[in-house]
Each structure stands twice: as structure tokens, then as C-alpha cells.
Swiss-Prot record:
Gene3D superfamilies: RNAP, epsilon subunit-like (3.10.20.730). HAMAP family: RNApol_bact_RpoY (MF_01553). GO terms for molecular function: DNA binding; DNA-directed RNA polymerase activity. The lineage of its organism: Bacteria, Bacillati, Bacillota, Bacilli, Lactobacillales. Belongs to the RNA polymerase subunit epsilon family. It comes from Streptococcus pneumoniae (strain P1031). One of its GO terms (cellular component) is DNA-directed RNA polymerase complex. Its EC number is 2.7.7.6. This is DNA-directed RNA polymerase subunit epsilon.
Amino acid sequence: MIYKVFYQETKERSPRRETTRALYLDIDASSELEGRIAARQLVEENRPEYNIEYIELLSDKLLDYEKETGAFKITEF
């Protein structure tokens, strides 16, 4: 399952929509909830400075759209 993680690069400032970033993770999980938990743990372990805002499971259509925009790249820690 591919998850899109929205985050701020620092926990020091208040979150602002304009500075929200995203990364993509390929998580092997049996349910969407398990995948969200695993994605959060993975990011928090490897990038503790990130302020995670939201984690979204990408549907096939959304994944195709993300690939078309050119912003899609799986992050590996």
C-alpha cells in the first residue's frame, strides 16, 4: 500500500498550509489503520523533527495522478 504523508519540516513553528510537504511510503500492512500506524512510526523514527499532519492511503486513481504530476517518488529510510 502506498501512503502519502503530509508534514511540516519542523515542530518549532505553527503549521502553515504553504509550507506543508509530502512524502510517499510503500508500507506492507494488512489494513489501512495498520499501515497508517506503521507509516507514522517509520517517519517519527527516521525524521523526529518532522511534524506529521496527515497520512493518506492512496487509491489507484490517486496514485496514477501523483505519478502523472511528477512529484511521486517513494521515500526509503
